[in-house]
């Protein structure tokens, strides 16, 4: 059950994504990393059709690195989000990509969090969710988020979101991989749903 969640703070950005790949009623893989890390300061996570997501993440990351080398374009979350948007728009009329993406990281001046949906609608947001998480967790994110949030508080919010998804979704979510972008680089954590007793 594809789900990803993102939260941005003043000096960090966090993205969490489930690690399970399923096809119809079958579980294909239980420990898949749905992230693409670019230059230790930007993270992309995509939900939807995993073939589309993998190919799009690879295409966008390689194209962005090429543009940086060839044309001197500085990579930022904004640049990558707009590249994803262009790729989605190109495919809309031929064969629509079934992906939603979250791009988080450190831009030239501040930390950014971008959301791109499967139709190419793009927005810069303080928090977002995609996939099945979008149906459930916005209430928690809206209630708990503040502009001066800390990393620990953001992880606590994400834990509440993961617990809610475990409670509401039919398919068993084993855990979420979390990427935290800070000035010191990218940290990786795992969030496991806490079962109520």
From Swiss-Prot:
GO terms for cellular component: cytoplasm; nucleus; proteasome core complex, beta-subunit complex. PROSITE patterns: PROTEASOME_BETA_1, PROTEASOME_BETA_2. InterPro entries: Ntn_hydrolases_N, Proteasome_beta2, Proteasome_bsu_CS, Proteasome_sua/b, Proteasome_suB-type. Its main location: cytoplasm. It is found in: Cytoplasm; Nucleus. Keywords: Cytoplasm, Nucleus, Proteasome. Non-catalytic component of the proteasome which degrades poly-ubiquitinated proteins in the cytoplasm and in the nucleus. It is essential for the regulated turnover of proteins and for the removal of misfolded proteins. The proteasome is a multicatalytic proteinase complex that is characterized by its ability to cleave peptides with Arg, Phe, Tyr, Leu, and Glu adjacent to the leaving group at neutral or slightly basic pH. It has an ATP-dependent proteolytic activity. PANTHER family: METALLOPROTEASE TLDD, PROTEASOME SUBUNIT BETA TYPE-1. This is Probable proteasome subunit beta type-4. The lineage of its organism: Eukaryota, Fungi, Fungi incertae sedis, Microsporidia, Unikaryonidae.
């Amino acid at each position: 059950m594809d789900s990803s969640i993102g939260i941005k703070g003043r000096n960090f950005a966090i993205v969490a994504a489930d690690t399970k790949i399923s096809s119809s009623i079958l579980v294909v893989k239980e420990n898949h990393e749905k992230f693409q890390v670019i230059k230790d300061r930007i993270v992309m996570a995509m939900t939807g059709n995993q073939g589309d997501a993998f190919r799009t993440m690879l295409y966008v990351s390689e194209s962005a690195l090429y543009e940086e080398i060839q044309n001197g374009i500085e990579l930022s979350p904004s640049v990558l989000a707009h590249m994803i948007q262009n790729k989605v728009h190109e495919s809309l009329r031929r064969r629509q990509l079934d992906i939603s993406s979250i791009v988080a990281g450190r831009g030239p001046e501040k930390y950014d969090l971008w959301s791109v949906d499967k139709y190419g609608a793009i927005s810069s947001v303080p928090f977002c969710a995609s996939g099945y998480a979008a149906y459930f967790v916005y209430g928690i994110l809206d209630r708990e988020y503040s502009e001066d949030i800390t990393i620990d508080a953001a992880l606590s919010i994400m834990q509440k979101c993961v617990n809610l998804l475990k409670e509401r979704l039919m398919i068993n979510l084993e855990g979420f991989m979390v990427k935290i972008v800070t000035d010191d680089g990218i940290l990786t954590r795992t969030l496991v749903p806490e079962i109520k007793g």
